[in-house]
Amino acid sequence: MRHILLILLFCSSTVFASFDMNERMQKTYTHILNLEFDIAKELLHVESNKNPNNGIIILNENYIDFLTILINEDQSYYSNAKDLKIDRLKACKEKDKNSPYYLYVQSEIYLQWAFCHLKFENYTIAAYEFIKAYSLLK
């Protein structure tokens, strides 16, 4: 009986940890908003080593790309980062579906990419991304 209880406890803790907005992730977010991407990337690296299943890592990585694209207006960076979006969304879908962050993170990624597509005048794709973001949250 104890073994079953320990297994259930372990499994539930890993499920709930799939989206963990812990102190390190909050600091990362603050550094991203301050455009201190190098510091944010270091914190993301630490979090990836300590808590590799944390879905908030995916969101914060996407924030870095989103702001880099909007600020630098670099077409090649934009083109390369589009592939990362697909990988990030796939990774999000493997996380805890019962978490309140599950749909939010996916929607936020779509919304950020909608603005990136607008920046480079890809209006049709941007509209699709806006609709996708909205449909996840309604």
Task: Write out the residue ranges for each language-model feature.
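Terminal low-complexity, poorly structured segments
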Residues: 1-5, 40, 55
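Sec-dependent N-terminal signal peptides
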Residues: 3-13
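Bacterial Sec-dependent signal peptides at the C-terminal "C-region" and cleavage site
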Residues: 11-21
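Short coil/linker segments at helix-helix boundaries
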Residues: 19-24, 28-43, 58-138
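Conserved structural position within tetratricopeptide repeats
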Residues: 48-49, 135
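Short solvent-exposed coil/turn linkers within tandem alpha-helical repeat scaffolds
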Residues: 50-53, 95-96
